[in-house]
């Protein structure tokens, strides 16, 4: 029986389409570790960062639904990404879509490299970006849409909005050929998600109960915790977009701190002038505004530009 079990184990290992005993030639271990940490930080932004931030802004009766939506959307987009999303974004194709040459990550093994890191790490890092982008739209649609509908939307929007935009900007498509610069996702992530959220909110209309009852953030400490997690995760988001632990990553890192700090102060001062006192929600809003603002240029502008 034990011999049969050993044979089955070896057959199972042999069925994998990658060489699990591949050499490490060409991999920079420092860059690899750096990018894996950055990927984990971006994933941390989704679960629990976005879930806590948006959950605190909603009414208490809708918090669990939004958190569940965030987690399931992350899972859905991750599966889409490894099946065909990465291929349509980063393989050779036309101006708008890549091809299907890397369908199900075909042709990618543990020996495959993206610069100085394993290509699997690049797949995971970019997949985290895709999941984050779709999760951002959830906040605009919160308390407006059914669970099943948001999943259908996530599938369609990821396929026909996020993937072509990623290819056009980062995959050698139309905008990349025109010289577009988007260091960490100002276009691919934030403008993309913002337009989807705005159009979705407009088409779906007002939230249930709007105008009939007070709709206030039910838990500001939860919003603060979500903001703090997003702030920390953003270092992986921006610095990781350098692709390695180099001086560009360092510039993106310090620019992230400076931009967020300047935006927090600006928002709080504006509240002091127009509302006589600052607020925690205002400080959190300013922080995220600064982080979003510096994202596309974190690795290209100087400190003064970030401020």
Can you name each region flagged by the protein language model?
Residues 2-307:
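Hydrophobic alpha-helical transmembrane bundles of multi-pass membrane proteins
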């Amino acid at each position: 029986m034990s011999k049969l079990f050993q044979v089955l184990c070896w057959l199972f290992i042999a069925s994998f389409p990658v060489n699990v005993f591949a050499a490490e030639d060409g991999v920079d271990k420092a860059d690899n570790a750096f990018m894996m940490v950055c990927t984990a930080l971006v994933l941390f932004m989704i679960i629990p960062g976005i879930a806590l931030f948006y959950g605190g802004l909603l009414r208490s009766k809708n918090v669990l639904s939004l958190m569940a939506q965030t987690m399931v959307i992350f899972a859905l987009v991750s599966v889409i990404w490894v099946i065909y999303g990465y291929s349509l974004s980063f393989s050779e194709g036309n101006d708008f879509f890549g091809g299907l040459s890397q369908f199900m990550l075909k042709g990618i093994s543990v020996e495959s490299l993206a610069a100085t890191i394993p290509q699997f790490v690049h797949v995971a890092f970019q997949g985290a970006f895709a999941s984050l982008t779709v999760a951002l739209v959830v906040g605009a649609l919160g308390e407006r849409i059914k669970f099943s509908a948001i999943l259908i939307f996530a599938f369609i929007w990821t396929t026909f909005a996020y993937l072509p935009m990623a290819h056009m900007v980062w995959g050698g498509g139309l905008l990349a050929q025109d010289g577009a610069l988007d260091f960490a996702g100002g276009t691919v992530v934030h403008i993309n998600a913002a337009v989807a959220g705005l159009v979705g909110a407009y088409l779906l209309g007002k939230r249930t109960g709007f105008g009939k009852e007070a709709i206030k953030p039910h838990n500001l400490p939860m919003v603060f915790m979500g903001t703090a997690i997003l702030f920390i995760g953003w270092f992986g988001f921006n610095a990781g977009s350098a692709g390695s632990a180099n001086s560009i990553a360092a510039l993106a890192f310090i620019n992230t701190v400076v931009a967020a700090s300047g935006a927090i102060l600006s928002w709080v001062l504006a509240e002091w002038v127009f509302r006589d006192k600052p607020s925690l929600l205002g400080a959190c809003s300013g922080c995220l505004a600064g982080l979003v603002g510096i994202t596309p240029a974190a690795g290209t502008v100087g400190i003064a530009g970030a401020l």
